[in-house]
């Protein structure tokens, strides 16, 4: 993909923020227009996150114009909105490779650029890291500024408020910018608010404010009265949230129009030299400047390649995704059981819960980006006699590990975890691979862990977890299902596998959706294939039988080898005193980079060809076939 830079005369001059800072202020609106158009053209040809970046064009330009990046340190939360940042910081010509194998990362990444201060992918980490960076700069007398940009979704997480509370107590110099692209926080944006923001962020007001504090410290009653008066003024003239952030120890400014580049530059210029923790609230529109994305910001959050002129996203008419299989199952159960409750931490669309939320709104809870709360909220519902189902990505369940142990498993409560995006996820890369859930759940007492090999198995396992009366997890991958026939729901025998093919010498123990590769290989190698179904409790009887009747056992999974399903098989063999040769195939001991799912599996030797080579090499090393 190549963009015709003749269409972008100003942007073509910008190879770093230093080039940007050479522009006159009156050139910035044109630059924003070109940057937005370039972003749209690039993403439409490569796929990626679009709507968030369209909404942060003016903010990105203003930040790099006012602050001396990379000396001043700019930290983006999550990173979906950082595409304009990448374009302005020397990676414009590499945008055609974003989210692709060996290409630039979809999120800010420290190894990629000195302008990427913090590697991100998960939400709500920016303020905590930013505070640490600001404290380090303060102790070194570096004179550098620290700016954190966080969205109105990410700031709902408890971690963000923990960091705000700590920052206010430390009174460290830093700026937190709330990028509010929803109507849920405030709507009072306009010329008056922009003007007031200039006043309250100005040096005169700041000097008077700080001077008054020093004097009034000696007269506590008057000091408290003046503090309340200032908070009331800001609460009336700005938004009700100003009082909240002021109470946390921040000087609140806003909300400011996040698409008015002149006002942003003026306000940020004022705020750059303010002391102590500062909080700037800006209002933006997700998808700004591209009508289809403004109309459907969720649909255009992450997009495949599409035609930007028509604005139509390609429709997937192939096999249903595992997410849809889950969503359909949940609706089917809710039709029969008013006590089943669906819970998601801000992943309604991704987890396949849109239809459920619309048809059964009283049985649906989106708890926002609050994974810890989601799990313990489910705990309470289970105690109350309900049947909670927590739909969560594998990579995000990591954030609620203590709750999984302390609140669910220790109490042996019937909470079902529908774990989406287990295994290789593809283009989002290292921060989003579902590589660890089997390993971190397998060691927890009372847990039942299931690994479906196709969509029908997935439905049956969800039903089994729903019925079993214990903590249960069903892990399934991103993407389309196999296309098998769906059968009526029935509870599976807990901890029992199923023999798929009987062969000789080699037995492949499959955990999950790599079963088609195992079956294809079994014909070449005359191997036995067992779909293990359960990681915990594991089918000890089957493992011992296979060990007695075969020379080689091969375990197959999309999870880290360390502590994974293969390790469970090794433990059974060891405790049974079996010396059968065991080959464990799974994800290696490093963070797996971005690529398509097929490319990643091939690189890891977990496609059919790679699995065959590993098995044959293993047997050769054993000395005989």
From Swiss-Prot:
This is 1-deoxy-D-xylulose-5-phosphate synthase. Catalyzes the acyloin condensation reaction between C atoms 2 and 3 of pyruvate and glyceraldehyde 3-phosphate to yield 1-deoxy-D-xylulose-5-phosphate (DXP). Its EC number is 2.2.1.7. The gene is dxs. Keywords: Isoprene biosynthesis, Magnesium, Metal-binding, Thiamine biosynthesis, Thiamine pyrophosphate, Transferase. It comes from the Bacteria. Gene3D superfamilies: 3.40.50.920, 3.40.50.970. Binds 1 Mg(2+) ion per subunit. Pfam families: DXP_synthase_N, Transket_pyr, Transketolase_C.
